[in-house]
Swiss-Prot record:
This is Odontogenic ameloblast-associated protein. It comes from the Eukaryota. GO terms for biological process: biomineral tissue development; odontogenesis of dentin-containing tooth. The gene is ODAM. O-glycosylated. Residues 267-279 have a biased composition (Basic and acidic residues). PANTHER family: ODONTOGENIC AMELOBLAST-ASSOCIATED PROTEIN (PTHR16237:SF3). Its main location: secreted. Residues 127-129 are annotated as: Interaction with ARHGEF5. One of its GO terms (cellular component) is cytoplasm. Residues 1-15 form the signal peptide. InterPro entries: Odam (IPR026802).
Length: 279
């Protein structure tokens, strides 16, 4: 097993190239666009420790590359313009002709149709260094759609911000109405709708009783108030619900009916309790 592992390491080290070499790859397309090295592709150079073992393969590769090199090195500027239109990755160098005009003459990209022709830079304004190809298109779109993308997001919050507190106030008021109704209080906004006659029907001062179901002005029924109001005369004589209306007629009716029942009963009950407590 040790021998097999050693042979594997030796094969891996011998197969790896020890000298840096330049191969024809997709990166050479940038050199064609930039007119570097006179637009020539370098041939494949199989440099390594195993080159002496395979002489026929290297000769065949060199013959094929030598046959392809003269055709590749005779590209003209017009051919480079059309070829650059197919590969929109880089902006041309200053010495080259207009890139946008060559792309329109050859194959037109769908992204270029969106930008207006006025925003395309001319040959005199081409930058001397290479940078991303999509930047002029994005700049053209930003200038073209500047009021659409920048003004609409600022207009929408201005319309929605003043509406939000009004909706919340209405919701809070609707939530507060049952909160007051639970304790038997009538909100102040409901006072003009109610009259003194309706309140006298809800709590009869002469009998000291109330109907089984007390109906509020808002239309909500409170069943448990009726049971508590029926026992007002028996449990605690004289207890009554205070009215929130400013009319004095209802208060006088309550006090006149209550005072007649309180005066004869309270002294008798006190005498009975005192006589029972004394030994």
């Amino acid at each position: 097993m040790k021998i097999i592992i050693l042979l594997g390491f030796l094969g891996a080290t011998l197969s790896a190239p020890l000298i840096p070499q330049r191969l024809t790859s997709a990166s050479n397309s940038n050199e064609l666009l930039l007119n570097l090295n006179n637009g020539q592709l370098l041939p494949l150079q199989l440099q390594g420790p195993l080159n002496s073992w395979i002489p026929p393969f290297s000769g065949i590769l060199q013959q094929q590359q030598q046959a392809q090199i003269p055709g590749l090195s005779q590209f003209s500027l017009s051919a480079l313009d059309q070829f650059a239109g197919l590969l929109p990755n880089q902006i041309p160098f200053p010495g080259q002709a207009s890139f946008a005009q060559g792309a329109q003459a050859g194959h037109v990209d769908p992204l270029q149709l969106q930008t207006p022709p006025q925003t395309q830079p001319g040959p005199s304004h081409v930058m001397p260094y290479v940078f991303s190809f999509k930047m002029p298109q994005e700049q053209g779109q930003m200038f073209q759609y500047y009021p659409v993308y920048m003004l609409l997001p600022w207009e929408q919050p201005q319309q929605t911000v003043p509406r939000s507190p009004q909706q919340t106030r209405q919701q809070q008021y609707e939530e507060q109405i049952p909160f007051y109704a639970q304790f038997g209080y009538i909100p102040q906004l409901a006072e003009p709708a109610t009259s003194g006659g309706q309140q006298q029907l809800a709590f009869d001062p002469q009998l000291g009783t109330a109907p089984e179901i007390a109906v509020m002005s808002t239309g909500e029924e409170i069943p448990y108030l009726g049971k508590e109001a029926i026992n007002f005369r028996h449990d605690s004589a004289g207890v009554f619900m205070p009215s929130t209306s400013p009319k004095p007629s209802t208060t006088n009716a309550f006090t006149s009916a209550v005072d007649q029942t309180i005066t004869p009963e309270l002294p008798e009950e006190k005498d009975k309790t005192d006589s029972l407590r004394e030994p």
